[in-house]
Amino acid sequence: MAVDSSNSATGPMRVFAIGNPILDLVAEVPSSFLDEFFLKRGDATLATPEQMRIYSTLDQFNPTSLPGGSALNSVRVVQKLLRKPGSAGYMGAIGDDPRGQVLKELCDKEGLATRFMVAPGQSTGVCAVLINEKERTLCTHLGACGSFRLPEDWTTFASGALIFYATAYTLTATPKNALEVAGYAHGIPNAIFTLNLSAPFCVELYKDAMQSLLLHTNILFGNEEEFAHLAKVHNLVAAEKTALSTANKEHAVEVCTGALRLLTAGQNTGATKLVVMTRGHNPVIAAEQTADGTVVVHEVGVPVVAAEKIVDTNGAGDAFVGGFLYALSQGKTVKQCIMCGNACAQDVIQHVGFSLSFTSLPC
């Protein structure tokens, strides 16, 4: 696997992430286009072999190309807020093809430090983002993403970073990547490893790998559905409570404190240990183990966005994490980090595709 590390980032790097890099192709399409490819409006699916021609066929609608993929979206927010080129770094795998070059150029344009591993003979991950009647339909081909392996000298690229981030999506390639990043961060004084649960299927399919990973995790992110699955898979709450909704504050708190035990293993090392659950329009719930071993619960309200201004909520979670990590890099409190995450999510949901409109710091 060849290495492409030709961008001109200046640093110093504050945040480093690994993930599945995707080139989003965003276009408005008629219903007949969805029908042609057997897509249901509003769904998010992986492309079947029969659907692979969708990406070339989409050219007739002049799609807009945007960097995509959960972790890449989040570090784009961090880079936007930190401003100085190279402040946020990212690694993943792309194909040796024009889409990979476009993706890299878009990241370079935003000032992001990237080191993409190029997988010969494979195509760059791509997602058709189809807008029809104000709804978004996604059809994704992961391509080279599954080939990613950390290069031996990745720590040189990430030198200086004290915040490390991975999504559970990376477990689909191999758990070794995230485990290596987490282990490295664990050995650096004051470094923090953060993990996103990403999706219910990640929680269910990678139970053992995630349990090992969580022991080296300082901050765990996820939405209420993902945490509900975590609670069920790891028996965090009594069996009769697994069907309860985390829209109920008391149950959300119980799930978060249960998840916190997966991070601490019942011990207090003095290290940062925090679980953060987003709940849509309901307040964010976070459970934190403080330096003296006590557990503190935080509840932070979510600003209201008028319904007519909400265009696309798909990237809200990615934007939240990006805002949170930026604030964390600035030494902000847990509450301030959550508020910054909320502000970034609030901005992103008012646009089609994952784009950032703020010209001044939102937090």
Curated annotation (Swiss-Prot):
Its EC number is 2.7.1.20. Binds 1 Mg(2+) ion per subunit. Mg(2+) binds at A185, I188, A191. One of its GO terms (molecular function) is metal ion binding. It catalyses: adenosine + ATP = AMP + ADP + H(+). InterPro entries: Adenokinase (IPR001805), Carboh/pur_kinase_PfkB_CS (IPR002173), PfkB_dom (IPR011611), Ribokinase-like (IPR029056). The active site is at D318. Its cofactor is Mg(2+). Pathway: Purine metabolism; AMP biosynthesis via salvage pathway; AMP from adenosine: step 1/1. One of its GO terms (cellular component) is cytosol. GO terms for biological process: AMP salvage; purine nucleobase metabolic process; purine ribonucleoside salvage. Gene3D superfamilies: 3.30.1110.10, 3.40.1190.20. Keywords: ATP-binding, Kinase, Magnesium, Metal-binding, Nucleotide-binding, Purine salvage, Transferase. The keyword Amino-acid biosynthesis does not apply. It comes from the Eukaryota. Belongs to the carbohydrate kinase PfkB family. ATP-dependent phosphorylation of adenosine and other related nucleoside analogs to monophosphate derivatives. It is a key purine metabolic enzyme in the opportunistic parasitic protozoan toxoplasma gondii as it cannot synthesize purines de novo. PANTHER family: ADENOSINE KINASE (PTHR45769:SF3). This is Adenosine kinase. It comes from Toxoplasma gondii. The lineage of its organism: Eukaryota, Sar, Alveolata, Apicomplexa, Conoidasida.
